[in-house]
């Protein structure tokens, strides 16, 4: 008989992004395969009652109490959720109340402050940074590099594009990326377009076997994906980084979030979004 998986619910009065982020940061500490579900826009007592019923049914069917992470703000809605048989982790109760006491002032209790368009200026920064990342992807446009906060450079399929997009969306950082081509690697020198922006460069590298796996998924049985080619490109790229004094990080075992955080810290970048 198959053992039931523990159910986890992320409940929010908005998108559920914050509940997911906070919950995942805790769940990753346990080597368990959770069955996860997000229930957004629980912003009325009626909706909360429906959620409670759903949680209680899930508990009865599996014999295991669901684990619930909630970022619901409204006090009445939260009171309804607290009647569930599930294990409820209410981030509002856990963090806001102690903060109110320490700061000696009540919180705003405004729904959606962390992800809603509360500050139009911050929204514009995020969109502008995102557009910059997309327009300056893979060396497509280089004449606006003077505006970049950072320029990621690496061989193909090392994680440049997703890292730039994450830096833009999460931190409002203007991130461009430039691919190191076969000619660049053969010369062993920085491409001319990057020389004047050397102080903004940050390199990415990757383990050869991982790079081969990624490239084989895209172009199987090609020279581009061969072990020989991948080994050559990685070795030459790392040698170039060292000779030019360009900081770099191996992305093989790192998440996009970890890569971005390391770049911000080591390159001393100033984030525009919090």
UniProtKB/Swiss-Prot annotation:
Query: Binding of ADP: at which residues?
Result: 154-161
Question: EC?
Answer: 2.7.11.33, 2.7.4.28
Keywords from the named record: Kinase, Nucleotide-binding, Serine/threonine-protein kinase, Transferase
The reaction(s) this protein catalyses? [pyruvate, water dikinase] + ADP = [pyruvate, water dikinase]-phosphate + AMP + H(+); [pyruvate, water dikinase]-phosphate + phosphate + H(+) = [pyruvate, water dikinase] + diphosphate
Q: Function of this protein?
A: Bifunctional serine/threonine kinase and phosphorylase involved in the regulation of the phosphoenolpyruvate synthase (PEPS) by catalyzing its phosphorylation/dephosphorylation.
Listed name of the protein: Putative phosphoenolpyruvate synthase regulatory protein
**Root EC class:** transferase
Q: Which GO terms describe its molecular function?
A: ADP binding; ATP binding; phosphotransferase activity, phosphate group as acceptor; protein serine/threonine kinase activity
Give the Pfam families listed for this entry: Kinase-PPPase
The text of the family note is: Belongs to the pyruvate, phosphate/water dikinase regulatory protein family. PSRP subfamily.
